[in-house]
Structure formats: structure tokens, C-alpha cells
């Protein structure tokens, strides 16, 4: 027994020293114990335990436990001390239950000390960040950095849609909302992929030069004149398209392919109202549509796409046209009768005129949506014009186009009677709008056909 007692006493003494060190650590953090008392707690022994009992009663062990209890452990008291110490002051700031640092003036809480110090300066009015060139002072370092750009002339923030530059991010956001009608996106900030998307969109718009787009023209022949299209302010409409919608449409267009049915695609097509108008051609002027080339046949997709025609010798640029899908399935059909001579020639050559006014571009009512690379459709499912060597996916468009050819001479304009040499000259005739120059004949035919604007 004489050998075991020293071991027990030594164990209790070691445990008391451990508690003393823990108490000293807690007191150093909370700042509730002065330096003199901290020196006394480092001496150990019974005096350390008494000082611990006097300063921190909640952390002290009962005297009976140190004398009679061989274990000498009072674990619940140690656990309570750790729980209570979590709510104590840390670096002069009180911590909340979720571990954040709480402001002593209000209910603001922050995980970082630097952010909390900046917040406290709002209450104290302290502005340590001062400009050496003017009386400007701020409580935030980032505000001083933005202010110094006004002296240096640096403008790191640039608008992706125009040449506007500014020194502050908030000014750029205001510019987007005011100039480009760009609504702020709720939630998180745009990711890097969205920024790259805007960069690609900017390059595409700059390459097109904001010129006229080749779109489906629903106007009668009397309205096909050399004037700016209603999309001349295309650059001001692009920013209204949100980046999320842009990516969604882009992914959808790439994932569709040829696996879907043309009728299903026509339901999802934003231009599906054109098919309704095309179905009323028996009583209304025919809508405008563009021809297609045998090299790149049309393919069902969610939006019209561009088809290039072989360039004529007299014209340097390629004729870019677009073909809209119809809700009715396409089937081969022969050349229509001559009673279509008064129909609008927009199905092919006339739309080529609008195609020549711009480079091969995207044809869609939503101009920010890119046109994916589309595979070639089987020519047997298309309507073929033997004179112009063009393919049409719509029977109505094919009928309108064939009505532009003369009955005796296929390369004679059925609108104004102008005779062309070949298919290239015939296409250039409508692309230039030459038939509109014959005002007397066009006026007579418009009156005869009861065509109204």
C-alpha cells in the first residue's frame, strides 16, 4: 500500500497541473485573469488549485475529490468549462453559437475578423484609408482602390457589348441596365462560362457589323424595297437575352439533331406562327422564304438556319438564305401550274436580296441564339427546283418559288417579265429588287391581286 499511494498522489498532482494549464489557456483567451494571477497559476501545487478555485469556480475540482477519490477526475466539470468557453470573448469579440464573431454594437456576425473590423468602423466612424491626393477617406480599402482609379485614369471594367469602360463595377452594372436593357440576374454571379459566352457573342456581333439579318420576310412584293430592316437596332436587342437562356437554347440546339420529328420540332420552334401564316396563303399574300442549295439541305431544328447558294459570276458574295420548317410533312411534288404567276417571289430570289445585304448569319427571331452545324438531309425528302437547283423542305415555299419562274421561259421573271440569262442572273435579279423598279407593272399586279401592305 505504501508503494501505491505515491503513485496516486503523483497522478492527482499531474492532473492538477493539467487543469492549471487549461485554466491558464482559458484565462489568456478571455482576458479575465491579470498577469499577476497568471504567474501564480504557473507555480503548481495546492496554491495553484486554490487560485483556480478562487478565479474560476466552475473549473475547479471539489476538495474531496482531490483527497479521497483515487481517480481524481470530475469529467462533467471539465466538459462544462469547454462548453462555456465557446461563448466567451475571443480576440475581444464575442462568438455566436455557429462560431461567427458578433458585433458589439448590433447583431451583425461574420466569420472573419477583418470583415468584422470593417463593419465596426461604421459604428465608430473611423476611416483609416485616406487618399494622399485629396481629402477622400473611407473605412474600406476596396473603396480607396476604386477612388485611386479616378486619379490614375485606369478603367479595368469593360462592357462586353460596346466600347464603354469604367473604373467601378457598379458603374458597369448601371451602364448595362440603362444602355442595353440588361436586367440583373438573380442568384449567384455569372460563371466564367457565361463570360466566355458573352465574349463569343460580342465577336460574332462585331463581325456581322450590326447589318441587316436574313430573316423570313412576310411582307407582300410592294414592301420589298431597299430600306433598313426592322432589325437594324439588333445590337440593342442582344443584351436583353439573359445568359442562362442563351446557354439553354445553345445546348438544346446542339442536342436535337435529326432524332426528333419535324412536327415535334415545329411545336418547339419560336417561329411556329409562320406556319400558320403560310397555311393561309390561299387567301393572303404568300410569305417570303429563302431557297436552299443542294450542298447543304435543310434539316429539322428548333430555328431556321442558313443555306449558302453557289455564288454567281456577277456577284462576289454568296447568297445566304434561310428555310423555315412547316408543320406538315414534306413530300416530293411536281412543278405547279402557271396560275401562281402573281404570287410573291419571296420564296427564293427575293429573299436572296436580303441575304446579300449581310454576311451568312444566324436567322432567328432571337438573334443571340447561335446556329449549330447541321447535317445534310436526304434530298429525296425535299422539293427540288430544277431550274435554280434549289431544295425546299416546305411544299408551300416550293410552290411560291416556282411561281416566280415564267411558264415558257423558266428564267423570265413572272412578276415584271424581265428575261434573265441563267439561274445566277435570275437569282441576282430578285436579290437586287429589280422587279420593284418596274413600278407600273408592279402596281398593276398588286391591284389585280388585291395585295395590301
From Swiss-Prot:
Keywords: DNA-binding, Metal-binding, Nucleus, Repeat, Repressor, Transcription, Transcription regulation, Zinc, Zinc-finger. InterPro entries: Ikaros_C2H2-ZF (IPR050589), Znf_C2H2_sf (IPR036236), Znf_C2H2_type (IPR013087). The keyword Nucleus applies. GO terms for biological process: regulation of transcription by RNA polymerase II. A zinc finger (C2H2-type) spans 101-123, 129-151, 157-180, 383-405, 411-438. 'Pegasus' was the winged horse in Greek mythology. This is Zinc finger protein Pegasus. The gene is ikzf5.
